[in-house]
Regions:
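Terminal catalytic/cofactor-binding subdomain
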Residues: 1-125, 132-138, 166-176, 180-183
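Short, well-structured alpha-helical interface segments that form or flank functional binding sites
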Residues: 13, 73, 135, 173, ...
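Histidine-centered divalent-metal-coordination microenvironment in nucleic-acid enzymes
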Residues: 17, 132-145, 318-325
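Beta-strand elements of well-folded, non-transmembrane domains
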Residues: 20-22, 60, 144-148, 325-327
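Short conserved micro-motifs at the rims of enzyme active sites and ligand-binding pockets
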Residues: 29-31, 68, 101-102, 152-153, ...
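Short alpha-helix boundary/capping segments
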Residues: 66, 162-166, 170, 333-341
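Loop-rich catalytic cores of soluble enzymes, especially ATP-dependent carboxylate-amine ligases
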Residues: 109-127, 134, 143-310, 322
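Substrate-recognition/cap regions that form aromatic- and gly/pro-loop-enriched pockets
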Residues: 312-313, 319-344
Length: 344
C-alpha cells in the first residue's frame, strides 16, 4: 500500500477539558449532571480534577473532519444537559475562583476504582493546590495505522527488531521531536495570555501586569497555561525527577522510580487525616499520570489495565500531545487548521 494511502488510515482523537460555571461566572458547585451519565463509566463525557471540570473524549477517528464532527456532537449534548443556570467555560484559564476550598474535587462513587480516583485528586490538591488543577486544555492523540508501520518497516528497517520494538522505538523518536520543537505549539496556538485576578490570589510573587480591574496579563505571552503559573510538578527540579525519553524502557523505569521514591514534603501531608485518605501514597508520583509533560507515549488500555504495565507489555498505542490551549474564539476550542498542523 502506498505511504499516502497508509497515512489516511492513521487515527486522531481529542480530549478537551472545560469548566462548568454558574450564572455569575464562578465555578459551579453542583454535582456532575445526571444527564451526562456516569463520570466513571461514560467514555465520551467524564470529569478531570474537579466535579465541575468536564472532559470530552472523542473516539479515535480518521481525519480532522470526523474528529471535529464528533467533538461538536458531544458539545451539543452537553449544552442540552447542563443545569439551566450553568454554562460551559470556553477558555483554558479558569473563571472566577473563590479560593482552594471552592473547587470541588471530582466524586466517582464508592467503588474501589471510584474511591481511588477521588483520593488521587485529593492528593493533587494537597500537593499542588486546587487552583492549578482548574486549568483546562486540549490533548491531541495520534496513532499510525498498522499498514503504515508495515510499509515503513519494509523501507527503513535494517535489523531484526520485532514489530512491537520497531513501533515503540519510532514512537519514542516522535516524542523526542515534540519535546525538541514543541515550543512551536503554544507559540502558534497559545490562547491564554490573560488570567482572572482570582486565580492569582495564592501567588504572592508574580510578574503579571494589570490589564483591568479583574484581569492580569503578561506582555507578549501566548500561553500562561504552559508557563510558571500553569501545570508543573514542583518536585521535578528539586528531586531530579524527569521522564527519560531515550527509549520506552528508560521512560517506564524513570516513572516507576518516582512512584517508588518517598518525598519528605509529601510525607508531611500524611496518608490519613480524621480517617480520610489525603493521598494515595507519599511518593514523588502517586501514579504515572501525575507526571506532567507536553507529550506522553500512551498504551491502549482495556478494563483496569495499569498504564506503565500496559506500556511494557503491549507497547505504545498512540502519542498524546498536551500543550494545546483551548481557543475561546472557536466553537469547540480547536479547528481543522490546528489539527492538520499537528498531524503534519
Amino acid at each position: 500500500m502506498p505511504f499516502k494511502a497508509c497515512l489516511k488510515a492513521n487515527l486522531i482523537g481529542i480530549e478537551k477539558e472545560g469548566l462548568r460555571v454558574s450564572g455569575d461566572g464562578s465555578i459551579a458547585q453542583t454535582p456532575h449532571p445526571e444527564g451526562l451519565g456516569s463520570a466513571l463509566k461514560n467514555p465520551a463525557i467524564t470529569t478531570d480534577f474537579s466535579e465541575a471540570l468536564l472532559e470530552l473524549v472523542t473516539q479515535p477517528l480518521k481525519g480532522a473532519d470526523q474528529v471535529l464532527d464528533e467533538l461538536t456532537t458531544i458539545h451539543n449534548y452537553i449544552y442540552h444537559h447542563l443545569p439551566e443556570n450553568e454554562r460551559f467555560w470556553p477558555a483554558s484559564m479558569p473563571c472566577i475562583l473563590r479560593g482552594q476550598t471552592n473547587i470541588p474535587i471530582a466524586n466517582y462513587g464508592s467503588s474501589n476504582l471510584g474511591m481511588m480516583k477521588t483520593v488521587y485528586r485529593r492528593g493533587l490538591s494537597n500537593r499542588y493546590g486546587s487552583v492549578m488543577q482548574a486549568i483546562a486544555g486540549i490533548h491531541f492523540n495520534y496513532s499510525f495505522s498498522l499498514e503504515f508501520w508495515q510499509s515503513y518497516r519494509e523501507v527503513i528497517s535494517k535489523t531484526d527488531t520485532d514489530s512491537k520494538g520497531f513501533m515503540d522505538d519510532h514512537y519514542m523518536g516522535l516524542t523526542r521531536n515534540v519535546l525538541r520543537y514543541g515550543w512551536l505549539i503554544p507559540y502558534l496556538f497559545g490562547a491564554s495570555a490573560t488570567v482572572c485576578k482570582s486565580f492569582m490570589h495564592d501567588y504572592h510573587d508574580h510578574n503579571l501586569e494589570e490589564f483591568d480591574d479583574n484581569t492580569l496579563y503578561l506582555p507578549y505571552a501566548t500561553s500562561l497555561r504552559m508557563g510558571d503559573i500553569g501545570y508543573q510538578n514542583s518536585q521535578e527540579d528539586e528531586k531530579g525527577v524527569k521522564a527519560n525519553y531515550n527509549s520506552l524502557c528508560h521512560y517506564i523505569f524513570s516513572l516507576r522510580a518516582a512512584m517508588k521514591t518517598s518525598c519528605e514534603d509529601f510525607e508531611k501531608i500524611g496518608l490519613k487525616k480524621n480517617g480520610e485518605y489525603q493521598q494515595l501514597n507519599t511518593n514523588i508520583l502517586q501514579i504515572a499520570n501525575e507526571y506532567y509533560s507536553s507529550v506522553r507515549p500512551k498504551p491502549i488500555l482495556y478494563g483496569n489495565d495499569r498504564p506503565l504495565r500496559a506500556l511494557n507489555n503491549k507497547g505504545i498505542g498512540y502519542i498524546e500531545i498536551r500543550s494545546l490551549d483551548i481557543n475561546p474564539m472557536l466553537e469547540v476550542g480547536i479547528d481543522k487548521e490546528q489539527i492538520e498542523f499537528l498531524e503534519a
